[in-house]
Every structure is written in structure tokens, then in C-alpha cells.
């Protein structure tokens, strides 16, 4: 587990009925990873070297579709954070392997939450969504994800009040 990755595959059919719908959702998933890279990198438990070698970034752009188009022309092959080279699945490769059940479940719950966002929000809404907004929308039943985010100090949805 010190060197293996935890790769999560998402069926393209779960992301939309048509190829065009699937491509739009995939572009928003990629956009989410680029927009919230610092938080997701911390969540991943990987080193910078490991990410660069096995799960490299595609690069930020404020237009999700442009990230996807750049990725399609990339020479990274499957060694990208969001791997789109598989015919029937999108593969998320960012996460370090684990034998801990709670870390495993937190990772699955995170990927599901990201995918749900990408399906339900349009490009403009994704562009405006902060990490705190994302965390606020996590399903309360995703207890492992919420606990893991708190452990990593990534759970930032509680408002801060100013004291006089």
C-alpha cells in the first residue's frame, strides 16, 4: 500500500444518456479536480512525486470543455488524475492505496459527490462553487467522508462568526 494507487472507475453510462451529455459531465469532473486541486491533493495522501508520475494534472482552465479537449490531445495516456482513455469508464487515479476501510469509503463517497455535482450543476455553477460550497452539499449519510475531511482539516463548511 505504500506505492499502490486507489483507482476509482466511473461508468460513462452513469454520467449521461448521450455521448454529448457524458462528455459535458466528464469535463465538469475534470474541472472540479483542477479547481480544487490543493484540497484534493491533501485528501489523496500521495506525494507530489507520486502524483506527477501516476496521476498528473491536465492543467486549469476556467472552461471545463477546454480542459477535456486538452486532455484528449495529451501525451500522458492513462497516467492522468482523471484518465479518459478507457472506452466505457472514467478512471480517477489521484488517491493513494489504503487498507483502512474508512479511508476507502471516504474516497468512494468523495468521488460519488464530485460526480453528482458534475451531473447536477452546469458549467457556470461549477465555476462559482467554492470548496466550502461543495462540502456543504455532501450528503449527511456520507459519514466516512465527513469524518475524513475533518481529520484532514478539509471540512470547512461551518460559518465563522466575528467576536467583538
Per-range role (PLM):
Residues 1-3, 12:
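Active-site histidine-anchored catalytic micro-motif
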Residues 3-5, 87:
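A general secondary-structure signal for short beta-strands and their flanking turns/coil
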Residues 13-164:
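C-terminal accessory/tail domains of diverse enzymes
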